[in-house]
């Protein structure tokens, strides 16, 4: 039980065993449906970082359970209490997609409102890795809900991605452990590739854009300067376009 794990942690030295125990405790707490019990356990965690992570994971799991039960409005209120901005963006986008899938005019309007909230939290000209992650989450949502806006948000960051890919290729020459490039060329693995290369982290978004509008996604791929990056983006766009699941259904423009 999480209570037993918590009691044992105090006996462990500062070592990988303690780190693993905190991870196990965090997972156990996130599965608890009793809010009072979870709060009691979290409050007893001595390590500040571990306590924060446990709280964030519990809050996220609680939102997921609430949304899965169909209580979307309750989930929406819970998202507003999150302190981690990226997690808040992710949950807003996920909830927006759930509303959108219901398909009624009222639900689509709610999805648009949630996406507007998520968009208000991002920097559309990302200055660091976290900014880019937030922007790409919003692009993920709009790729289904308002594809034209998703493309318009993605297009300005292609130049930044070109710079990042070129820089990664240069740095790979001086790191023998780097398996993302071979003789300066990006290795196009059938699996997801190396998450250290930012482009590989956002293949889902590229596939969703390809599903929404393959011609436009292919034109976007042409803006990537390196041939290997162009090939990767085009292949992922095609993969998205040939998916068997239903393509996103467009609706009126989102109020911005």
Over which residues does each language-model region extend?
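Non-catalytic tandem-repeat scaffold regions and their flanking low-complexity/translocation tails
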Residues: 1-256
């Amino acid at each position: 039980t999480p209570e037993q794990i918590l009691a044992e942690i105090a006996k462990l030295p500062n070592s990988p065993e303690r780190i693993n125990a905190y991870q196990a405790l965090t997972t156990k707490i996130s599965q608890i449906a009793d809010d009072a019990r979870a709060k009691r356990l979290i409050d007893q965690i001595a390590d500040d970082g571990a306590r924060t992570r446990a709280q964030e994971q519990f809050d996220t799991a609680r939102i997921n359970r609430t949304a899965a039960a169909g209580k979307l409005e309750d989930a929406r209120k819970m998202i507003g209490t999150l302190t981690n901005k990226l997690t808040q963006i992710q949950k807003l986008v996920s909830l927006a997609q759930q509303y959108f899938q219901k398909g009624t005019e009222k639900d689509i309007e709610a999805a648009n409102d949630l996406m507007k909230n998520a968009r208000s939290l991002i920097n559309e000209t990302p200055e660091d890795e976290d900014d880019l992650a937030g922007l790409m989450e919003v692009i993920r949502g709009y790729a289904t809900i308002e594809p034209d806006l998703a493309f318009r948000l993605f297009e300005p960051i292609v130049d930044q991605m070109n710079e990042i890919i070129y820089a990664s290729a240069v740095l790979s020459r001086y790191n023998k452990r780097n398996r993302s490039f071979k003789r300066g060329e990006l290795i196009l693995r059938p699996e997801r590739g190396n998450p250290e290369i930012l482009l590989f982290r956002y293949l889902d978004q590229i596939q969703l854009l390809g599903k929404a509008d393959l011609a436009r996604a292919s034109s976007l791929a042409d803006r990537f300067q390196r041939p290997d990056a162009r090939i990767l983006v085009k292949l992922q766009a095609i993969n998205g376009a040939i998916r068997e699941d239903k393509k996103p259904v467009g609706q009126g423009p989102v109020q911005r």
